[in-house]
Amino acid sequence: MSTSAPLLSRYRQLSPAASIRVSPLCLGAMTFGVSDGEMFGECSKEMAFAILDHFYQQGGNFIDTANGYRAGESEMWLGEWMASRKNRDDIVLATKYAAGYRGHEKNRIQVNYGGTGTKSMRLSVDASLQKLQTSYIDLLYVHWWDYTVSIPELMHALNDLVASGKVHYLGISDSPAWVVSKANQYARDHGLRQFVVYQGLWNAAKRDLERDILPMCLDEGMGLCPYGVLNQGRFRTEEGFRDRDQTNNAGGRNIIPLSEHDRSVSRVLDIVATSKGVPLLQVALAYVMQKAPYVFPIVGVRKVDHLTGVEPAVHISLTDEEVNAIENAYEFDPGFPHTFLSGSMFAQGPPKGGYSPDVVWWTKMLGTFDWVEGAKPIRPQP
């Protein structure tokens, strides 16, 4: 690869179930706006456009937003930017429905402007199309599972949007694995479009997604777009933690408080980063990209230099030893039945998951086997 080539210009297929091609990083647009600034920090329209311009110039084409981000500012600004740059068809645009996107209009009865049902879905999509100044959405997510809509209603209503041309692909976020598997099986059984990508919280300090969501994605042929991969500002060097303590994280996110757990994982990331001569956050980003195939981290920033600081992570290769060092920063418990299958629940030592035939202890008692390995993540190109 030429050293002058844009950092994000080696594209990848989104998932085995979706042929669309996207940049290796997805730009998160929840940071774009001034509404809810006390919780999420502020990013002006001028700065948002500068970030978008840089991302696009580096080859980035995958952008994520939602109907309710920043009281609609995120979608509106994205629409204005694409219209002014005349590049809508270059962009793979993802948005979401389920949030109460008109909550700032206090005079309205809100009950059907949010939720996962058909009316909320159609109203939200039409509003998003208007704000985004486009006739179609590349990827529509169900933002979260609210236990109200039936699987048949959901999948038929979503498929109607695909058939209408308003939506090209379907995704789901922040939902249990059993819901996604059940919905996809229903879709396949009835000739409907299935979910092709999952979005959820995942980073080196928060690995819950690995229990059931990640194995489900691999089995369902789904891609994975993790958010929070940089721990929402809580991965830092010791100097960075001192700065945060002094400023009380002024201007940044203040959703989840900093913990000693964040500090301990950060220390290990810093050790790996120092040994490789790269910034800590690049290692944190490279970690999730090399854990599984079809992983496209969502990175949200409020300044251009925040983005330039992490983009080189797409070319960082971590050794198995470095990945193990990061994961040994704390004890992750996959829980039952995974520890039963691996046999670790019966033994002294750390808990381990059983996600492939080579680690199922009952099987290993029967003989010596050679197994076909599963799909591997793309190795970074230097």
UniProtKB/Swiss-Prot annotation:
Gene Ontology terms, MF aspect: oxidoreductase activity
Keyword annotations of the record: NADP, Oxidoreductase
InterPro entries named among the record's database cross-references: AKR_Detox_Biosynth, NADP_OxRdtase_dom, NADP_OxRdtase_dom_sf
General function of this protein: Norsolorinic acid reductase; part of the gene cluster that mediates the biosynthesis of aflatoxins, a group of polyketide-derived furanocoumarins, and part of the most toxic and carcinogenic compounds among the known mycotoxins. The four major aflatoxins produced by A.parasiticus are aflatoxin B1 (AFB1), aflatoxin B2 (AFB2), aflatoxin G1 (AFG1) and aflatoxin G2 (AFG2). Within the aflatoxin pathway, the norsolorinic acid reductase aflE may play a role in the conversion of norsolorinic acid (NOR) to averantin (AVN).
Binding site for NADP(+): 64, 173-174, 199, 228-238, 302-310
Protein name: Norsolorinic acid reductase B
Pathway participation: Mycotoxin biosynthesis; aflatoxin biosynthesis
Gene (name only): aflF
GO biological process: one example: aflatoxin biosynthetic process
Enzyme Commission number(s) of this protein: 1.1.1.-
UniProt site positions, description: Lowers pKa of active site Tyr: 96
Stated family: Belongs to the aldo/keto reductase family. Aldo/keto reductase 2 subfamily.
Pfam families given in the database record: Aldo_ket_red
Active site: residue positions: 69
Residues involved in substrate binding: 143
